[in-house]
């Protein structure tokens, strides 16, 4: 009985060790918009990614795999934004206003993959006092009248907020817009190494337990 209790007690730290491991991954969403109701009209698409008013941890928003049967025009870019649509752009929250505003002739559909990542998502520091927000909007030809959304104040089709703990919150104002979340299963390198060490520890303890316990 003493040997049994010793082995069980030895296993407990390893079990606890595994219990506190968490996998951190970027937030990935697949976005598609049914634009048939405004097909053939001229307008604009707007992508923004801005930090909050207080101390904000670094993060980025990637818009990739952009596809449409409409036509993309020339963009107006503000802040820390790189790339061109199509195929992809990256917006960083390094400046107060980061915006990619592009002319667009609507077709029947448009789609893209949205990825939110960086330290604010992967490794929150507990020091930041504000999160960051990604927003996607569609406007009519005057550049200010929202289309395909119930948000007539700001014109957002949807927003995704990054919270202080690295989680994300979606708010969708647009019935024709589908935003489906997908979770990446790739752990941080350090986490993968710790998992390997923990597994080896459990195997060793199990072998020891089998050796010392009477059959």
Regions found by a protein language model. Give the residues of each.
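Extreme N-termini of proteins with methionine-enriched Sec-type signal peptides or N-terminal signal-anchor
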Residues: 1-2, 213
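Short, threonine-centered small-residue motifs that mark membrane-proximal processing/anchoring sites
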Residues: 2-27, 178-200
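A broad, structure-centric signal for solvent-exposed, well-ordered loop/edge residues
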Residues: 8, 42-45, 98, 193
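Generic marker of residues within folded, mature protein domains
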Residues: 15, 21-23, 37, 102-104, ...
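N-terminal segment immediately downstream of the Sec signal-peptide cleavage site
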Residues: 25-72, 177-185
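Generic "edge-of-domain/loop-turn" microfeature
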Residues: 38-40, 54-56, 119-121, 143, ...
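Mature, soluble, non-transmembrane domains
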Residues: 77-185
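C-terminal membrane-anchoring or membrane-association module
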Residues: 203-215
């Amino acid at each position: 009985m003493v040997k049994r209790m010793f082995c069980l007690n030895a296993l407990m730290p390893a079990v606890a060790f595994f219990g506190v491991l968490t996998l951190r991954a970027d937030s990935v969403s697949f976005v598609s918009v049914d634009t048939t109701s405004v097909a053939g009209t001229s307008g604009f698409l707007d992508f923004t990614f801005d930090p909050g008013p207080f101390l904000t941890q670094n993060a980025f928003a990637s818009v990739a795999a952009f596809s449409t049967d409409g036509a993309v025009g020339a963009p107006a870019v503000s802040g820390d934004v790189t790339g061109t649509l199509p195929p992809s752009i990256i917006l960083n929250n390094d400046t107060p206003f980061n915006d990619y505003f592009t002319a667009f002739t609507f077709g029947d559909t448009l789609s893209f993959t949205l990825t939110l990542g960086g330290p604010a998502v992967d490794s929150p520091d507990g020091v930041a006092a504000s999160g960051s927000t990604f927003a996607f909007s569609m406007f009519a030809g005057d550049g200010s009248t929202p289309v395909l959304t119930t948000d007539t104040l700001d014109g957002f089709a949807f927003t995704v907020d990054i919270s202080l703990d690295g989680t994300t919150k979606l708010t969708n104002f647009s019935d024709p817009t589908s935003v489906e979340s997908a979770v990446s299963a790739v752990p941080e390198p350090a986490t993968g190494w710790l998992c390997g060490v923990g597994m080896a520890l459990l195997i060793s303890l199990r072998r020891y337990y089998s050796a010392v316990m009477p059959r």
